[in-house]
Amino acid sequence: RRLDLLKLHNFEDVLGMVRLIPILSYRKIPDQIRVTDLEDCGSELLIRGRLSVLLPAPIRLRLEGIYCILERETFRLSIPLTPGPLRYYLKDYRKYDYLPQEERVVPKTLAKYVDPSRKTPATPQTCFLSRDGRFFPLLGEFQTEESAYLFRKSYEDRRQYLLLDDTAKSTSFLEQYIRTFLLHFFPQEPSDPS
């Protein structure tokens, strides 16, 4: 009789666990996205797409102003856009002079033709190129191509931005960006090297 009770108890546990299996689909989300639509709304970028996995319940995510809704087999993501100008800081500031009246830098090879009273040696804080446009925030772990220009509002600002251009609107780029966002919520287990 006790053995029958134990089997019944374990059977009920197993039945309950079977109902929990769909929850595992959430961990697969970062690798299951496909962008299907992009809408530039001026102050935000709206991205819609499909998931290759069926979610048992909707979920809403927010991180650093980015908002995402995942529901059944679809997702919607809203990325806030920051208007420029923003600054791209040059690393080799010793090769430049700063023109305070124009708020810009020029290479020392060209600065030799500028009146000395109108220039000063560039510092890390003054050695930047300004760029107008609209920019979207990068998440800390997001990897961009080495050639990408990463902009900031000021030298002290640790938050980096990328110019919203055709490259940033490409499907492959957006899917990589969304995957990085989702990995904050659904971290992947390290793969077994063996």
Predicted regions and their residues:
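DEDD superfamily 3′-5′ metal-dependent exonuclease/proofreading module
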Residues: R1-S194
